[in-house]
């Protein structure tokens, strides 16, 4: 089975990587779809985020990374995905993700959304938290791969 894992991944965190690994173990194939959203100012370009993800997932079998614009269900359909994969850190994530899952089903009922609970030690992680800690010079190497930490440090020293 092929799972579509959509997101902005700005930047990719160890929480994302854990979900990708577990998705690969469960479904065999994970298509990581990086959202290109021109109305949202990204820290890293879409191309750079794709490079970061490809580097971070090179040892995870069945992973592929693409850019996408538009609706998640359209991306799933165009790439022959079987399901949509999403992670949950807290109850607040569930409320939002459930609404998105229902919206996706209303647009194309072919796609189920499968939720995986984040590992407890990653439950505090979000891309926003990582960027905030990095902005103030805090240690982030336990939150993101080393090369992403270096990318963020370069941005914050310029």
Swiss-Prot record:
Belongs to the bacterial CoaD family. The record marks 16 as: Transition state stabilizer. The gene is coaD. The keyword Ligase does not apply. Keywords: ATP-binding, Coenzyme A biosynthesis, Cytoplasm, Magnesium, Nucleotide-binding, Nucleotidyltransferase, Transferase. It is found in: Cytoplasm. This is Phosphopantetheine adenylyltransferase. It is an enzyme of class 2 (transferase).
């Amino acid at each position: 089975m092929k799972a579509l894992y959509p997101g902005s991944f700005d930047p990719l965190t160890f929480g994302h990587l854990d979900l990708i690994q577990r998705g690969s173990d469960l479904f065999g194939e994970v298509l990581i779809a990086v959202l290109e959203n021109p109305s949202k100012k990204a820290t890293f370009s879409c191309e750079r985020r794709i490079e970061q993800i490809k580097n971070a997932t090179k040892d995870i079998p069945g992973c592929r990374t693409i850019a996408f614009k538009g609706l998640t269900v359209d991306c799933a359909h165009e790439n022959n995905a079987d399901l949509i994969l999403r992670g949950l850190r807290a109850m607040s994530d569930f409320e939002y993700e459930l609404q998105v899952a229902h919206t996706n089903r209303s647009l194309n009922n072919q796609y189920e959304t499968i939720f995986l609970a984040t590992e407890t030690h990653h439950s505090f992680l979000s891309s926003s938290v990582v960027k905030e800690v990095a902005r103030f010079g805090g240690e982030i190497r336990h939150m993101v791969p080393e090369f992403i930490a270096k990318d963020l440090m370069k941005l914050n020293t310029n």
